[in-house]
Amino acid sequence: MNTNTYAIIQMGGQQLQVQTGRFYDTCDFSILKPDTKIIIYKVTMIHLNSQLVIGKPWLHNAMIKGRILHSYRDNKVTIYRMHSKKKMRRKQGHRQNITRFIVDGIFLDGKNI
């Protein structure tokens, strides 16, 4: 694996810059069990050595292989609404479900790069 090699993918409504061997957090895929293998086809760009391969909008000959590590819940965020000079106060909490996955390989034209 070259340390200069990375890809930009779209997953879970967000774009992520991914490298082989690193793990990333994305939106909830709790229906997938740990150690489930995943393939991501929505690859926007690949940086290989000193050249860029850019898709319009996706690279049709590229894919990312990875696996699910685990799912968990993020830290609680407290939302507090208050209208001044009124007796309106509302306190609410929210915890986002998150899935952590690891990238096993970046493939371009069927070859692991």
Curated annotation (Swiss-Prot):
It is found in: Plastid, Chloroplast. It comes from the Eukaryota. GO terms for cellular component: chloroplast; ribonucleoprotein complex; ribosome. The keyword Hydrolase does not apply. Keywords: Chloroplast, Plastid, Ribonucleoprotein, Ribosomal protein, RNA-binding, rRNA-binding. The keyword Lipid metabolism does not apply. Pfam families: Ribosomal_L21p. One of its GO terms (molecular function) is structural constituent of ribosome. GO terms for biological process: translation. Part of the 50S ribosomal subunit. Belongs to the bacterial ribosomal protein bL21 family. This protein binds to 23S rRNA. This is Large ribosomal subunit protein bL21c.
